[in-house]
UniProtKB/Swiss-Prot annotation:
It is an enzyme of class 2 (transferase). Pathway: Carbohydrate metabolism; galactose metabolism. HAMAP family: GalP_UDP_trans. NCBIfam families: galT_2, PRK05270.1-1, PRK05270.1-2, PRK05270.1-5, PRK05270.2-2. This is Galactose-1-phosphate uridylyltransferase.
Amino acid sequence: MILVDKFVTHVISESSFEEMDRIYLTNRVLARVGEGVLEVETNLDKLIDLKDQLVEEAVRLETIEDSQTAREILGTELMDLVTPCPSQVNRDFWEAYAYSPEQAIEDFYQLSQKNDYIKLKAIAKNIAYRVPSDYGELEITINLSKPEKDPKEIAAAKLVQASNYPQCQLCLENEGYHGRVNHPARTNHRIIRFEMVGQEWGFQYSPYAYFNEHCIFLDGQHRPMAISRQSFERLLAIVEQFPGYFAGSNADLPIVGGSILTHDHYQGGRHVFPMELAPLQKTFRFAGFEQVKAGIIKWPMSVLRLTSDSKEDLINLADKIFQEWRQYSDSSVQILAETDGTPHHTITPIARKRDGQFELDLVLRDNQTSAEHPDGIYHPHKDVQHIKKENIGLIEVMGLAILPPRLKEEVEQVASYLVGEAVTVADYHQEWADQLKSQHPDLTDKEKALAIVKDSVGAIFVRVLEDAGVYKQTEQGQAAFMRFVEQVGISLD
């Protein structure tokens, strides 16, 4: 069948266009791809595959240049044909929400996959596996989904005149944005508007999802990330308004924060993270908040879990803990609230509903540096940075490692080294590879070697999280943790 005809047939069946629109749609496609595609045939069946073939034909016809950016821009323009306009998407969402919030969310999720905003084909390239640990099973992913720019595009991006539009990748102005070499194409992007604590916010999915239904809740205004009482109010409002989803925030300080600190936002989704399954290892009640169940969970980072029927009680207690942590120091365990007025303490908060109750996990963070640990005292230390050196953000805090693409080949290379097929590994992996070889000197089976290396990556990720934990998993560390809890105020009843 002719490629353009087949694509247009799919567009008509997947959108509000009708058969009468066929000629119009064909001309829309030809204007973007080139009339030389008219005779091209296809044996593909899926809409996104047909779109990809049209993009490659546009490159062949020299309608667009042979670059990742040009491909992305054309691809999103073609998929915009199956995407209703923003007002219609919002109208459909809220009409469905009135009958079933779950159905409204599901419909928007399906649209975001159907129109290739969520890059399912790219996400499928990621490597993902689980590893056992003292803290339960952890999740390891090697992130291969994001396409890497080639050197020509990187050079071109440096020459592009600076633009403040959109101000960042999370601004509402991204909806329908054409794209350029240093800003992603978002023609097929749609955002659900909703009111939260008296302000307009947006709800969208993450194009390169790290977990099931990975979504972003973003401030309608371009305002910097800030953890405050409002953060707890908003997170609990989200889990109430979007049933089945958790919601969490990155911390708001360098080193312990996420990659985007310039635009206030939260992340969420329908995924049970390892941290959610972590049991309480110590329980108590805070004075004045006796109705709130509280405790420290068994986790490599320092986490207080609060559970209650009352959102108001949770918000008030979380804010009290946060305010106390911001000014709390304990020199006996290298915890310092500030240096010369520069704050070191913040929180990574996560909210969910469980068994009808609201739950908040408060992860204590400290971004101090030292001569011994210039990248951060509570950051992956030098000896584990060959696996993970980036900030430990919200997703990793919860037990899902997001590791760089280089590790795919490097893990295989270390496995080859263990069985004698390779004589060298990357310099920064040499010590690790030699250590594994000394532990397994007689390995000959490549598959077994690969399993050993992958398990070792998991064990190193545990160390990464332990490095980021402010109170260590030692008698001294846990006693210090309880001193902070007592400072907040424990109920003696």
